[in-house]
């Protein structure tokens, strides 16, 4: 049993866990019924620990005989009316987040005890003999943890030891707080052995360079601790190996990532040519935006620009300093990405536009971006994220920025000269490659590399990242691999990402662990959950109403099963989910249901001709009788009645005749075996969407979009179509939708073409079991 909304095809060529085909809907309906009926709040954690995007958990079993309507709509009105209090909370959260986005400056970031200690170790450059930044020592003394250590709330041995060594050295150097030093030394003694077993993937950036100098400093200060553990010896060996690989001439002449960890060369300071290195300073006076590296440079040179950078930080953060600053581009790009993936970006469109304008101002089509503006060094992580969010928000960016990261073997490195790969950075490269345009070969190669890398890591159960400790990175990667962006419906993606997003519990791995509160924010998560549940309650109410429409029209008597009705409504709700788009959503679902009903009639050629004659006659009679078609054909009458109500309920202008014209084109194509479904759905969405443009249908770009979308959806029905052709057409459609030009169509109108194409792709890509699981999660399983 297949639904004409999509195709019943089997094509092993296209990627995914199953061949592209439409699911058998009766099996799907029984599965959804069972899971919806068996769901309870105690099972709300289902899917949070793994992707589950295409394979439901063990709790999902097939049963028969349950009444889906009864199990899912009881108490819906009560839920809707009880959300009045949540609306106030939603409004409060929206205003709070808008304030965050409007006031973004250099970037919000947690303090680094390690970097603060390096700044605290700087002696008065005027020769006073004391610390030049005494407030840093106050910060250190005020931020010691109960166990005697310094560091992030997440206990990571690398992080706690490097922070604690640095802080106890700073305090001991200035003979301050001996009691705090004693507690810190006790912590070090008790935890040094844990270096032996810590996972290397959790080792902070440059740890093998930055930790040994602290160990040697501590020894010179007669701080006693065990220094013969296998883990420590291994770190020293890694340092020796890295030193042998350092291109000393290059690091003195061009900016490299070594500038970020210059303090790690404190034991070999005599090999550093500061006259050359200071020429590589960032415009703000820092060494690659690192307070610790800049503090070491200030110790060695007394440079005025280094001093000014550190003075600004100490004053800005009241004595503490972060491990990286500024991070203005990173904060804006990542925050926008999080809001979009959580499904709440519509509340912040003006603020997102400003964030994107800011990032685009510093974007280089040749080099990409780094976390901070004006950087002479770029990385693939920030470049990938910046590229994706800029392109999806309509900004002109070139993929040439990725060329510098590709090596001779076709692998993509995060930094030029890097020797190992990051899961999260490669994941973001993969996500950037998803939005490629036709002919962008560098992105095609990036997609090939990143797909294989991530698939291999998943197969080996090695989706542990060296740059971030997040709630469910394996789930994020799994979803992206299993559900390609072309097939990812907005509400499905939001549902999974809300469960994967860690909020303020996420820690990033720099030289120490750090937090980015404007990227990982509990308010984002709370708003996403509230909004999701509010939308879901409305969707459940609509599902009840569309069932009543189905019964009143007698569509069951024409062979339309309730399973097909559910699938039609789910696809519409998962694609066009916003409360204010209820009319569009219902119009799409009803149109799809009617199309399914008509095409399942198995009519002869003559019967089809009679149907069209009734349709044409009904149009004439409707015009003559003021809206009453007067036809004897029940299905034709249902079309006219439904179209009439759509026109009354969903638009500020009269769209009745335009909707009927769209239907007329469809029935004419249907009579001769044509395929006009996609065009009918697009026209229905755009007409019921209340476009401010009364006649966009004559626009040249509208016709282009319609042609490509129709071709894509038609291909997804053919069993012989090549994957490369579908991908090429999807790339062309994405380009038409996201690029802007003078005299262009409204972006909301263009997006509807992509919405329809992605819905066809989704239905062809995902298995019956997966779609059933998604229906439950999107429509019936409440977020807690």
UniProtKB/Swiss-Prot annotation:
Transmembrane segments: none
Ligand binding (Mg(2+)): 379, 381
Interval spanned by the transit peptide: 1-57
Family: Belongs to the terpene synthase family.
Pathway entry: Plant hormone biosynthesis; gibberellin biosynthesis; Secondary metabolite biosynthesis; terpenoid biosynthesis
Keyword Nucleus: no
GO biological process, one term: gibberellin biosynthetic process
Residue span of motif DXDD motif: 379-382
The name this protein goes by in its record: ent-copalyl diphosphate synthase 2, chloroplastic
């Amino acid at each position: 049993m297949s639904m004409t909304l999509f195709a019943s095809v089997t094509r092993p060529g296209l990627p995914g866990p199953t061949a592209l085909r439409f699911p058998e809907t009766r099996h799907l309906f029984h599965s959804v019924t069972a899971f919806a009926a068996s769901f309870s709040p105690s099972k709300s954690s289902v899917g949070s620990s793994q992707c589950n995007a295409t394979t439901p958990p063990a709790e999902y079993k097939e049963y028969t005989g349950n009444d889906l309507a009864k199990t899912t709509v009881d108490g819906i009105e009560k839920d809707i009316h009880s959300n009045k209090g949540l609306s106030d909370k939603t409004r409060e959260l929206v205003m709070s987040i808008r304030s965050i986005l409007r006031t973004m400056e250099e970037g919000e970031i947690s303090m680094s005890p390690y970097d603060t200690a390096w700044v605290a170790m700087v002696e008065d450059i005027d020769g006073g003999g004391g610390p030049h930044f005494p407030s840093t020592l106050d910060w250190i003394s005020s931020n010691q943890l109960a166990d005697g250590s310094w560091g992030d709330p997440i206990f990571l041995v690398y992080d706690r030891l490097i922070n604690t060594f640095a802080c106890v050295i700073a305090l001991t150097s200035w003979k301050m707080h001996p009691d705090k030093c004693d507690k810190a030394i006790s912590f070090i003694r008790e935890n040094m052995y844990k270096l032996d077993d810590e996972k290397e993937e959790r080792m902070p950036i440059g740890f093998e360079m930055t930790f040994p100098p602290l160990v040697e400093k501590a020894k010179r200060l007669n701080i006693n601790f065990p220094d013969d553990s296998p883990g420590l010896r291994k770190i020293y060996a890694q340092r020796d190996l890295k030193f042998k690989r350092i291109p000393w001439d290059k690091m003195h002449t061009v900016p490299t990532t070594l500038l970020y960890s210059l303090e790690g060369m404190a034991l070999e300071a005599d090999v550093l040519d500061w006259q050359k290195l200071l020429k590589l300073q960032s415009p703000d006076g820092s060494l690659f935006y690192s307070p610790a590296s800049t503090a070491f440079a200030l110790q060695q040179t007394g440079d005025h620009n280094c001093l000014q950078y550190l003075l600004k930080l100490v004053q800005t953060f009241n004595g503490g300093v972060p491990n990286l600053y500024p991070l203005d581009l990173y904060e804006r790009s990542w925050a926008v990405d999080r809001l979009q993936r959580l499904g709440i970006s519509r509340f912040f469109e003006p603020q997102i536009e400003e964030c994107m304008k800011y990032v685009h101002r510093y974007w280089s089509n040749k080099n990409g971006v780094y976390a901070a503006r004006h950087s002479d060094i770029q990385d693939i992580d920030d470049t990938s994220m910046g590229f994706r969010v800029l392109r999806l928000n309509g900004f002109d960016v070139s993929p040439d920025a990725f060329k510098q990261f590709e090596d001779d073997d076709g692998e993509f490195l995060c930094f030029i000269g890097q020797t190992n790969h990051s899961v999260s950075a490669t994941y973001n490269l993969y996500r950037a490659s998803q939005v490629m345009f036709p002919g962008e070969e560098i992105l095609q190669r990036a997609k090939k590399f990143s797909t294989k890398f991530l698939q291999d890591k998943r197969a080996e159960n090695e989706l542990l990242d060296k740059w971030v400790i997040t709630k469910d990175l394996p789930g994020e990667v799994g979803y992206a691999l299993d559900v390609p962006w072309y097939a990812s419906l907005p509400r499905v993606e939001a549902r999974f990402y809300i469960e994967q997003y860690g909020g303020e519990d996420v820690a990033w791995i720099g030289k120490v662990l750090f937090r980015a509160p404007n990227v990982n924010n509990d308010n984002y998560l709370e708003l996403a959950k509230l909004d999701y549940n509010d939308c879901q309650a409305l969707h459940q109410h609509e599902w009840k109403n569309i069932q009543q429409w189905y019964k009143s029209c007698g569509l069951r008597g024409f062979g339309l099963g309730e399973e097909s009705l559910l699938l039609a409504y789910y696809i519409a709700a998962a694609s066009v989910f916003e409360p204010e788009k209820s009319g569009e959503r219902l119009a799409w679902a009803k149109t799809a249901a009617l199309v399914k009903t008509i095409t399942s009639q198995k009519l002869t050629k003559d019967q089809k001709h009679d149907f069209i004659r009734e349709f044409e006659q009904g149009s004439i009679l409707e015009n003559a009788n003021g809206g009453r078609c007067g036809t004897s054909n029940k299905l034709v009458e249902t079309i006219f009645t439904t179209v009439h109500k759509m026109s009354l309920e969903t638009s500020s202008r009269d769209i009745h005749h335009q909707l009927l014209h769209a239907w007329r084109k469809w029935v004419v194509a249907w009579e001769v075996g044509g395929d006009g479904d996609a065009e009918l759905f697009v026209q229905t969405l755009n007409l019921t969407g209340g476009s401010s443009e009364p006649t966009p249908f004559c626009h040249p770009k509208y016709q282009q979009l319609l042609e490509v979308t129709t071709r894509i959806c038609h291909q997804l029905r053919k069993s012989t179509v090549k994957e490369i052709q579908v991908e090429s057409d999807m790339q062309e459609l994405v380009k038409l939708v996201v690029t802007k030009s003078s005299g262009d169509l409204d972006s909301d109108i263009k997006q509807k073409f992509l919405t329809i194409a992605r819905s066809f792709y989704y239905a062809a890509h995902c298995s019956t079991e997966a779609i059933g699981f998604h229906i439950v999660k999107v429509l019936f399983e409440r977020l807690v």
